[in-house]
Regions:
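A conserved FAD-binding loop/helix module that cradles the flavin
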Residues: 234-265
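Cofactor-binding loop segments of dinucleotide-utilizing enzymes, especially the Rossmann-like FAD-
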Residues: 90, 113-116, 148, 236
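FAD-site-proximal beta/loop scaffold in flavoenzymes
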Residues: 50-82, 167-241
Length: 268
């Protein structure tokens, strides 16, 4: 990218060190493309999520794969995976996290999911592979607390049993708690894999750029144009967590639209 003239500014947090408006007004950029993704992990806001041994799936997989934690101390990014690991969630990332934990020599790995197997959002083959590798599925169970020892480390999770209620307006059966059905599972590592969303930093400092209720930027599907003049956006920050292919496609469409926008602006 540098070879074709792209200048890369590192350690520059847009929305904190300067805003989108400042980029355009003080730094004289004619157009801005926002492609900050949807990498902010969701947590459950339950007791014990701040204990040692609790990871988001983002951090867990990033440490294991990109930062090569499995080769510590050769690489200086350790990750402490205990003998018993609970992964909370039912998507593809949850399956990836569970299978990765096994490869890091965990003796027992659980998938904790509040609905039944039929409702698992992960691909069918991911579920089958996880089962073949020995991962135990704790279905129709919901995590309500993470329990710690006197030193602040995870020692167990507390779950409550669920049952599927009547279908709602969308036809989906929502899980309902079964009263007085709480139980504990001894674990020493917990991975929360319940999805991720956009970091609100740029959106919150750009009030005239519209977002949806999830915090994603509203942009034209074909051009990436937002509701703010000269500002374009694409990828997961618009669609929510999706695929690399879709993000690349959005970038190409936006590049064409930005080029046309700049030409039109010069000719005015």
């Amino acid at each position: 990218m540098r070879k074709i003239g792209v200048k890369i500014e590192v350690n520059s947090v847009v929305g904190k060190l300067f805003t989108v408006d400042e980029l355009m007004q003080e730094f004289n950029f004619d157009a801005v493309f926002i492609a900050t993704g949807a990498g902010l992990p969701h947590f459950m806001n339950i007791p014990g999520e701040n204990l040692n041994g609790v990871y988001s799936s983002n951090e867990f997989l990033t440490r294991c794969n990109l930062m090569k934690a499995y080769r510590f101390p050769e690489y200086a990014t350790p990750i402490n995976v205990g003998k018993k690991v609970a992964v909370v969630g039912g998507g593809n990332v949850a399956m990836d996290s569970a299978r990765t934990a096994l490869r890091l020599e965990a003796e027992k790995v659980y998938i904790v999911y509040r609905k039944s197997e039929k409702e698992l959002p992960s691909r069918r083959e991911e579920v089958e592979h996880a089962k073949q590798e020995g991962i135990e599925f704790k279905l129709l169970n919901n995590l309500v607390a993470i329990l710690g020892d006197e030193k602040g480390y995870v020692k167990a999770i507390r779950c409550i049993k669920m049952e599927l209620g009547e279908p709602d307006a969308s036809g989906r059966r929502r899980p309902v708690e079964i009263s007085n059905s709480e139980f504990d599972i001894d674990v020493d590592t917990v991975v929360i894999a319940i999805g991720q969303g956009p970091n609100p930093l740029i959106q919150s400092t750009t009030p005239d750029m519209q977002t949806n209720k999830r915090g994603n930027i509203i942009a034209d599907e074909e051009t990436g144009k937002t509701t703010k003049e000269g500002v374009f956006a694409g990828g997961d920050i618009v669609t929510g967590a999706a695929t690399v292919i879709l993000a690349m496609g959005a970038g190409k469409k936006a590049a064409k639209a930005i080029d046309e926008y700049l030409i039109e602006k010069r000719n005015k």
